[in-house]
């Protein structure tokens, strides 16, 4: 885990990891900053820990957050298909969906649902080990806000 991630996440209340940890040490390191929830990814086979689940439905602030590793791309599916997928996996249509798998950073609004793929801090776009992206959400207002950050040696910048 890059030290830039630790710097960016300093002061956050909760950390949501959309999967593909590959090692539990990532959760241990992030856990020093706050509670960690992980959506089990295809790169997490064999990792057993209560902080990993196939899908999460969390109440954070006044919002419902659904988190899952595999989620259809909002640019490739209709909102009706995406809402059906949400109800199947979360039993509801949450305010925010956090997902991973593709390692492609993206923020899309799907009929009022904020769909966030933060990308990957270490394997962006499923390529070689290098600096990538993370996301940060602000849930203090009347609408959830998400910002993607690009990591680089010694820092980070909002996209």
Residue ranges of predicted features:
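Short, flexible, glycine/charge-rich loop motifs used to bind or transfer phosphoryl groups or to couple energy/partner
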Residues: 3-7, 26-29, 55-56, 84-88, ...
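Short, solvent-exposed aromatic-acidic interface loops
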Residues: 147-158
């Amino acid at each position: 885990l890059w030290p830039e991630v630790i710097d960016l996440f300093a002061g956050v209340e909760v950390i949501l990891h959309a999967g593909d940890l590959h090692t539990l040490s990532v959760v241990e390191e992030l856990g020093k900053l706050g509670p960690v929830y992980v959506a089990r990814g295809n790169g997490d086979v064999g990792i057993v820990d209560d902080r990993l689940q196939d899908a999460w439905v969390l109440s954070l602030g006044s919002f419902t957050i659904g988190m899952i590793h595999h989620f259809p791309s909002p640019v490739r599916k209709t909102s009706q298909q995406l809402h059906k997928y949400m109800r199947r996996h979360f039993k509801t249509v949450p305010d925010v969906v956090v997902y991973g798998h593709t390692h492609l950073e993206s923020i899309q609004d799907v009929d009022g649902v904020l769909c966030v793929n933060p990308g990957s801090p270490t394997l962006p776009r499923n390529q070689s080990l290098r600096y990538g992206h993370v996301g940060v959400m602000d849930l203090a207002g009347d609408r959830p806000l998400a910002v993607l950050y690009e990591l680089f040696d010694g820092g980070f910048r909002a996209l």
